[in-house]
Amino acid sequence: MDNFTYILADEDNGEAAVIDPSWDLEKIFGVIEKNGWKVKYIINTHTHFDHILGNQQIAAVTEAKIIQHKNSTQPNDIPVEDGQIISIGKMMIRIIHTPGHSKDSMSLVVNNELVFTGDTLFIGNCGRVDLPGSDSSELYDSLFGKIANLDDSMIIYPGHNYGSTQTSTIGQEKKTNYVLKARSRGDFLRFMASADE
């Protein structure tokens, strides 16, 4: 599935967050231990199994609190909503509710410099909308009403390694990602329906 798991850490005070822990937990623990970081939070961009598989094991070892969007039906410690701010050391993480791929999808804007988009936006593509709880119209609002309005220089870190590169920028994706081509809502819904066929 080519999942990405990320570790955000403030190197000054050692606080860290693990984003979307799935497989290869030994590697995650190794990086945390090597750097002496204290994991404060586990943050899920959404709660499909491949993004939460490692939650309980990491929480058990690190005592980190699990953060998910309030629409989640999975076990969590801190439900969050659109616009909420979470801090990891000096880093400020702003929650953007970006439903479409799932009802509880959210993107994480860090210090207004980078954004973790989960399965809402990939490099060169976007998340599926043929799964239970997915909705093309909601994805349209998330992509064009929220993600595309972020600063063009913001670096994108997606939930899967499906693109030609592992990262990109908002500006680059607006130029090259066919999903972000300017379309009416109706055209976008037809486009997504044809992609699912």
Located regions from the model:
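Active-site HxH/HxHxD metal-binding segment of metal-dependent hydrolases
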Residues: 1-2, 13-16, 23-94, 175-179, ...
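Residue-level detector of conserved, well-ordered beta-strand and adjacent loop positions
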Residues: 9, 81, 99, 171
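Metallo-beta-lactamase
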Residues: 102-196
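Aromatic/hydrophobic pocket-lining residues that form the small-molecule binding cavity
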Residues: 21, 52, 139-143
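Conserved catalytic cores of phosphodiester-cleaving nucleases, focusing on short active-site segments
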Residues: 8, 17-19, 116
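Core dinuclear metal-dependent hydrolase active-site scaffold
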Residues: 7, 85-110, 115
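Histidine-centered catalytic micro-motifs
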Residues: 42-52, 96-104, 156-163
